[in-house]
């Protein structure tokens, strides 16, 4: 089987950079494509990381322009986010940016799609009164619904609060997640990147699924087998 060609939307983010490096180091994948929004980021990924890069600002690019950027790839990962840069960008990046990439995948005939969402995004009762996060969750919930309604072989990953510690490779079993404690659950960004890789490598276990991700005590391999 030929190595999988993966395009990463939001490659300049913290999870995206970790993911690009993991894909580059894994022989199951071809050189990944970093989709970024500034020329400086293009130069960084091409010259310092040693991967391909496309200057495609999903906020302002058309669906056709995004399609042209990704059409040669087998799978797309959406890890872009507004990153606390204002409510307007939550809707133009986290929501409409995701929807445009989904439409571009459909237009390009790309089936495999992995998106990084947020823990319990579908549960309005959980997040509606969390101060400062309501708009973020509205965007994530709505984007996830568009993904589910697409014809893509999607995986929706819903991580807890993202941490910068070194990855542990250990996750909390889904049947051990306590609903009341969810607001305090966290996961290292490196583990999110690692799970994206594993999702791409194990489509039979992850396609058409929404998966909560928080750090725990179960090895990632066993976690995937339980899905």
Swiss-Prot record:
Gene3D superfamilies: NAD(P)-binding Rossmann-like Domain. Keywords: Cytoplasm. It comes from the Eukaryota. InterPro entries: NAD(P)-bd_dom (IPR016040), NAD(P)-bd_dom_sf (IPR036291). GO terms for cellular component: cytoplasm. It is found in: Cytoplasm. PANTHER family: FLAVIN REDUCTASE-RELATED (PTHR15020), UPF0659 PROTEIN YMR090W (PTHR15020:SF50). Present with 704 molecules/cell in log phase SD medium. Belongs to the UPF0659 family. This is UPF0659 protein YMR090W. It comes from Saccharomyces cerevisiae (strain ATCC 204508 / S288c) (Baker's yeast).
């Amino acid at each position: 089987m030929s190595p999988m060609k993966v395009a990463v939307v939001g490659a300049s983010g913290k999870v995206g950079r970790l993911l690009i490096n993991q894909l580059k180091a894994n022989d199951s994948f071809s050189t990944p494509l970093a989709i970024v929004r500034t020329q400086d980021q293009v130069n960084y990924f091409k010259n310092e990381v040693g991967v391909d890069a496309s200057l495609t600002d999903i906020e302002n690019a058309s669906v056709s322009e995004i399609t042209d950027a990704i059409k040669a790839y087998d799978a797309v990962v959406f890890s872009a986010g507004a990153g606390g840069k204002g409510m307007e960008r939550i809707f133009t990046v986290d929501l409409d940016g995701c929807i445009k990439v989904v439409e571009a995948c459909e237009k390009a005939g790309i089936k495999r799609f992995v998106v990084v969402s947020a823990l319990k995004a579908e549960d309005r009762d959980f997040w509606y009164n969390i101060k400062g996060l309501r708009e973020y969750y509205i965007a994530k919930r709505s984007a996830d619904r568009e993904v589910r309604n697409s014809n893509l072989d999607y995986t929706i990953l819903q991580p807890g609060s993202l941490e910068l510690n070194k990855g542990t490779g250990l996750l909390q079993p889904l049947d051990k997640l306590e609903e009341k404690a969810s607001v305090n659950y966290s996961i290292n960004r490196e583990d999110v990147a690692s799970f994206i890789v594993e999702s791409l490598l194990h489509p039979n276990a992850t396609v058409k699924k929404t998966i909560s991700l928080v750090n725990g005590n179960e090895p990632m391999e066993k976690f995937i087998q339980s899905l």
